[in-house]
Protein backbone atom coordinates (compact mmCIF):
# COMPACT_ATOMS: atom_id res chain seq x y z
CA UNK A 1 0.00 0.00 0.00
CA UNK A 2 2.64 2.56 0.98
CA UNK A 3 4.64 1.76 -2.16
CA UNK A 4 1.62 2.24 -4.40
CA UNK A 5 0.72 5.48 -2.67
CA UNK A 6 4.29 6.75 -2.93
CA UNK A 7 4.58 6.19 -6.67
CA UNK A 8 1.05 7.54 -7.18
CA UNK A 9 0.02 5.10 -9.89
CA UNK A 10 -2.97 6.42 -11.83
CA UNK A 11 -6.06 4.26 -11.52
CA UNK A 12 -6.17 3.86 -15.28
CA UNK A 13 -2.67 3.21 -16.55
CA UNK A 14 -1.88 4.58 -20.00
CA UNK A 15 0.55 1.80 -20.83
CA UNK A 16 0.54 -1.93 -20.30
CA UNK A 17 3.54 -4.19 -20.05
CA UNK A 18 3.62 -6.73 -22.86
CA UNK A 19 5.65 -9.79 -23.62
CA UNK A 20 7.64 -7.76 -26.11
CA UNK A 21 8.87 -5.52 -23.30
CA UNK A 22 10.65 -8.47 -21.70
CA UNK A 23 12.84 -9.45 -24.64
CA UNK A 24 15.65 -7.00 -23.96
CA UNK A 25 16.00 -7.81 -20.28
CA UNK A 26 16.12 -11.61 -20.39
CA UNK A 27 19.49 -12.83 -19.18
CA UNK A 28 19.15 -16.56 -18.88
CA UNK A 29 17.47 -16.75 -15.48
CA UNK A 30 13.99 -18.13 -16.20
CA UNK A 31 13.43 -19.26 -12.63
CA UNK A 32 14.16 -15.85 -11.13
CA UNK A 33 12.23 -14.14 -13.92
CA UNK A 34 9.18 -16.30 -13.22
CA UNK A 35 9.30 -15.43 -9.51
CA UNK A 36 9.53 -11.70 -10.26
CA UNK A 37 6.59 -11.99 -12.64
CA UNK A 38 4.52 -13.94 -10.11
CA UNK A 39 4.99 -11.51 -7.24
CA UNK A 40 4.75 -8.36 -9.36
CA UNK A 41 1.52 -9.55 -10.91
CA UNK A 42 0.18 -10.39 -7.44
CA UNK A 43 1.08 -6.90 -6.18
CA UNK A 44 -0.76 -5.19 -9.02
CA UNK A 45 -3.71 -7.57 -8.65
CA UNK A 46 -3.96 -6.52 -5.00
CA UNK A 47 -4.20 -2.93 -6.21
CA UNK A 48 -6.95 -3.87 -8.69
CA UNK A 49 -8.90 -5.82 -6.06
CA UNK A 50 -8.77 -2.82 -3.74
CA UNK A 51 -9.80 -0.39 -6.49
CA UNK A 52 -6.46 1.38 -6.58
CA UNK A 53 -6.02 0.44 -10.24
CA UNK A 54 -8.47 -0.41 -12.98
CA UNK A 55 -6.38 -3.14 -14.57
CA UNK A 56 -3.33 -5.26 -13.87
CA UNK A 57 -0.50 -4.27 -16.24
CA UNK A 58 1.10 -7.68 -15.75
CA UNK A 59 -2.05 -9.69 -16.45
CA UNK A 60 -1.01 -10.70 -19.96
CA UNK A 61 2.68 -11.30 -19.29
CA UNK A 62 3.61 -14.93 -19.79
CA UNK A 63 6.76 -16.84 -18.99
CA UNK A 64 8.74 -16.75 -22.23
CA UNK A 65 11.15 -19.47 -21.17
CA UNK A 66 10.27 -22.85 -19.78
CA UNK A 67 11.67 -23.43 -16.32
CA UNK A 68 13.93 -26.43 -16.58
CA UNK A 69 13.48 -28.84 -13.73
CA UNK A 70 16.74 -29.31 -11.91
CA UNK A 71 17.97 -32.88 -11.72
CA UNK A 72 21.48 -32.48 -10.32
CA UNK A 73 22.27 -35.26 -7.88
CA UNK A 74 25.59 -35.03 -6.08
CA UNK A 75 27.38 -38.34 -5.68
CA UNK A 76 28.34 -39.51 -2.23
CA UNK A 77 31.96 -38.61 -2.95
CA UNK A 78 30.87 -35.11 -3.98
CA UNK A 79 28.70 -34.74 -0.89
CA UNK A 80 31.54 -35.80 1.37
CA UNK A 81 33.82 -33.30 -0.36
CA UNK A 82 31.28 -30.54 0.25
CA UNK A 83 30.95 -31.64 3.88
CA UNK A 84 34.68 -31.71 4.46
CA UNK A 85 35.36 -28.34 2.88
CA UNK A 86 32.34 -26.71 4.52
CA UNK A 87 33.83 -27.77 7.83
CA UNK A 88 36.79 -25.50 7.09
CA UNK A 89 34.60 -22.43 6.55
CA UNK A 90 33.80 -21.79 10.19
CA UNK A 91 30.67 -20.20 11.61
CA UNK A 92 28.15 -19.38 10.26
CA UNK A 93 28.43 -21.01 6.84
CA UNK A 94 30.24 -24.22 7.72
CA UNK A 95 27.79 -25.59 10.29
CA UNK A 96 24.87 -24.07 8.38
CA UNK A 97 25.70 -26.04 5.23
CA UNK A 98 26.41 -29.21 7.18
CA UNK A 99 23.03 -29.05 8.92
CA UNK A 100 21.29 -28.64 5.57
CA UNK A 101 23.12 -31.73 4.36
CA UNK A 102 22.06 -33.73 7.42
CA UNK A 103 18.41 -32.64 7.53
CA UNK A 104 17.51 -31.88 3.91
CA UNK A 105 15.87 -28.62 4.89
CA UNK A 106 15.48 -25.73 2.50
CA UNK A 107 18.17 -23.11 2.82
CA UNK A 108 15.84 -20.53 4.40
CA UNK A 109 14.63 -22.87 7.11
CA UNK A 110 17.96 -23.05 8.93
CA UNK A 111 18.90 -19.51 7.94
CA UNK A 112 15.78 -18.18 9.69
CA UNK A 113 15.75 -20.67 12.55
CA UNK A 114 15.29 -19.29 16.07
CA UNK A 115 17.10 -20.68 19.07
CA UNK A 116 13.81 -21.36 20.85
CA UNK A 117 12.71 -23.66 18.02
CA UNK A 118 15.18 -26.19 19.42
CA UNK A 119 13.85 -28.41 22.18
CA UNK A 120 15.84 -28.34 25.47
CA UNK A 121 17.79 -31.47 24.58
CA UNK A 122 18.55 -30.27 21.04
CA UNK A 123 16.98 -33.44 19.67
CA UNK A 124 14.75 -31.66 17.16
CA UNK A 125 14.03 -28.35 15.46
CA UNK A 126 10.36 -27.38 15.61
CA UNK A 127 9.56 -24.96 12.78
CA UNK A 128 6.29 -23.05 13.31
CA UNK A 129 3.71 -23.11 10.53
CA UNK A 130 4.14 -19.39 9.88
CA UNK A 131 7.78 -19.98 8.99
CA UNK A 132 7.34 -23.10 6.84
CA UNK A 133 6.64 -23.25 3.13
CA UNK A 134 3.60 -25.52 3.49
CA UNK A 135 2.01 -23.35 6.21
CA UNK A 136 2.11 -26.38 8.50
CA UNK A 137 4.47 -26.90 11.44
CA UNK A 138 7.43 -29.15 10.73
CA UNK A 139 9.41 -31.13 13.27
CA UNK A 140 12.96 -31.88 12.13
CA UNK A 141 14.62 -34.66 14.16
CA UNK A 142 18.33 -34.12 14.68
CA UNK A 143 20.73 -37.02 14.27
CA UNK A 144 23.60 -37.46 16.68
CA UNK A 145 25.87 -35.72 14.17
CA UNK A 146 23.46 -32.80 13.82
CA UNK A 147 23.11 -32.48 17.60
CA UNK A 148 26.88 -32.26 17.91
CA UNK A 149 26.94 -29.37 15.44
CA UNK A 150 24.05 -27.55 17.11
CA UNK A 151 25.61 -27.90 20.56
CA UNK A 152 28.82 -26.30 19.27
CA UNK A 153 27.14 -23.17 17.87
CA UNK A 154 27.82 -19.85 19.61
CA UNK A 155 25.05 -18.19 21.58
CA UNK A 156 23.54 -14.97 20.25
CA UNK A 157 23.49 -11.90 22.47
CA UNK A 158 21.03 -9.59 20.75
CA UNK A 159 18.42 -11.66 18.94
CA UNK A 160 16.81 -15.05 18.31
CA UNK A 161 18.50 -16.21 15.11
CA UNK A 162 20.78 -19.23 15.37
CA UNK A 163 22.80 -18.29 12.30
CA UNK A 164 23.64 -14.61 12.33
CA UNK A 165 26.52 -12.18 11.93
CA UNK A 166 24.70 -9.52 13.94
CA UNK A 167 24.47 -11.25 17.30
CA UNK A 168 21.13 -12.80 16.41
CA UNK A 169 19.40 -9.57 15.39
CA UNK A 170 19.11 -10.60 11.74
CA UNK A 171 19.39 -13.98 10.04
CA UNK A 172 22.43 -14.83 8.01
CA UNK A 173 22.35 -13.71 4.38
CA UNK A 174 24.68 -13.68 1.39
CA UNK A 175 24.09 -17.22 0.15
CA UNK A 176 25.62 -16.60 -3.28
CA UNK A 177 28.85 -15.25 -1.82
CA UNK A 178 29.07 -18.14 0.63
CA UNK A 179 28.49 -20.67 -2.16
CA UNK A 180 31.15 -18.98 -4.32
CA UNK A 181 33.60 -19.15 -1.42
CA UNK A 182 32.81 -22.83 -0.90
CA UNK A 183 33.34 -23.56 -4.59
CA UNK A 184 36.68 -21.77 -4.49
CA UNK A 185 37.80 -23.77 -1.47
CA UNK A 186 36.73 -27.03 -3.13
CA UNK A 187 38.71 -26.17 -6.25
CA UNK A 188 41.75 -25.32 -4.15
CA UNK A 189 41.57 -28.62 -2.27
CA UNK A 190 40.70 -30.99 -5.10
CA UNK A 191 42.31 -29.19 -8.03
CA UNK A 192 39.03 -28.84 -9.93
CA UNK A 193 35.54 -27.47 -9.27
CA UNK A 194 32.58 -29.77 -8.88
CA UNK A 195 30.16 -29.84 -11.81
CA UNK A 196 27.65 -27.01 -11.38
CA UNK A 197 25.39 -27.38 -8.37
CA UNK A 198 23.29 -25.15 -6.13
CA UNK A 199 22.45 -25.38 -2.44
CA UNK A 200 18.98 -26.78 -3.11
CA UNK A 201 20.59 -29.74 -4.91
CA UNK A 202 21.76 -30.96 -1.49
CA UNK A 203 18.12 -31.57 -0.56
CA UNK A 204 17.41 -33.54 -3.73
CA UNK A 205 20.63 -35.49 -3.33
CA UNK A 206 19.76 -36.47 0.22
CA UNK A 207 16.33 -37.72 -0.84
CA UNK A 208 17.81 -39.75 -3.69
CA UNK A 209 20.46 -41.42 -1.57
CA UNK A 210 18.01 -42.09 1.26
CA UNK A 211 15.90 -44.08 -1.16
CA UNK A 212 19.01 -45.89 -2.39
CA UNK A 213 19.79 -47.13 1.14
CA UNK A 214 16.27 -48.48 1.56
CA UNK A 215 14.30 -45.73 3.27
CA UNK A 216 10.64 -45.80 2.22
CA UNK A 217 9.55 -43.00 -0.14
CA UNK A 218 6.74 -41.80 2.13
CA UNK A 219 9.21 -41.44 5.01
CA UNK A 220 11.54 -39.44 2.78
CA UNK A 221 8.61 -37.20 1.85
CA UNK A 222 7.88 -36.70 5.54
CA UNK A 223 11.53 -35.78 6.19
CA UNK A 224 11.35 -33.23 3.38
CA UNK A 225 8.15 -31.75 4.80
CA UNK A 226 6.12 -32.39 1.67
CA UNK A 227 2.36 -32.21 2.10
CA UNK A 228 0.33 -35.26 1.13
CA UNK A 229 -2.15 -34.49 -1.63
CA UNK A 230 -5.69 -35.61 -2.31
CA UNK A 231 -7.46 -38.07 -0.03
CA UNK A 232 -4.21 -39.00 1.73
CA UNK A 233 -3.65 -35.37 2.68
CA UNK A 234 -7.18 -35.10 4.02
CA UNK A 235 -7.20 -38.20 6.20
CA UNK A 236 -3.59 -39.07 7.04
CA UNK A 237 -2.12 -36.85 9.73
CA UNK A 238 0.37 -39.16 11.41
CA UNK A 239 3.62 -37.27 11.97
CA UNK A 240 6.06 -40.17 11.34
CA UNK A 241 8.33 -38.61 13.97
CA UNK A 242 9.91 -41.90 15.07
CA UNK A 243 10.36 -43.01 11.47
CA UNK A 244 11.86 -39.65 10.47
CA UNK A 245 14.25 -39.81 13.42
CA UNK A 246 15.46 -43.25 12.35
CA UNK A 247 15.70 -42.27 8.68
CA UNK A 248 17.74 -39.12 9.29
CA UNK A 249 20.10 -41.01 11.58
CA UNK A 250 20.58 -43.65 8.90
CA UNK A 251 21.26 -40.91 6.38
CA UNK A 252 23.81 -39.23 8.67
CA UNK A 253 25.59 -42.55 9.13
CA UNK A 254 25.67 -43.01 5.34
CA UNK A 255 27.04 -39.53 4.74
CA UNK A 256 29.61 -39.81 7.52
CA UNK A 257 30.60 -43.49 7.74
PLM feature spans:
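Generic recognition of well-ordered alpha-helical segments
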Residues: 2, 38, 42, 144, ...
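Basic, Lys/Arg- and aromatic-enriched nucleic-acid-binding interface segment
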Residues: 6-39, 49-113, 121, 132-136, ...
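Short, basic (Lys/Arg/His-rich) helix/loop patches that form interaction surfaces
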Residues: 13, 80, 84-94, 103, ...
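Hydrophobic recognition helices of helix-based DNA-binding modules
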Residues: 40-47, 150-153, 210, 255
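Short, polar N-cap/turn motifs at the start of nucleic acid-interacting alpha helices
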Residues: 116-124, 196, 215-235, 257
Amino acid sequence: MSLLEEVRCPRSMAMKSTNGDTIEVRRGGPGSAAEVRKWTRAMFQFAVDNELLVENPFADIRNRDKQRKRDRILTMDELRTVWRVAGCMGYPWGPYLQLIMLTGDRRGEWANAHADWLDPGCTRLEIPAAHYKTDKPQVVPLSAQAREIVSSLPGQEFGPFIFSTTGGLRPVSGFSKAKARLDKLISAETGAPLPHWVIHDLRRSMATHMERIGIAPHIIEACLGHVLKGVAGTYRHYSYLAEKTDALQRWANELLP
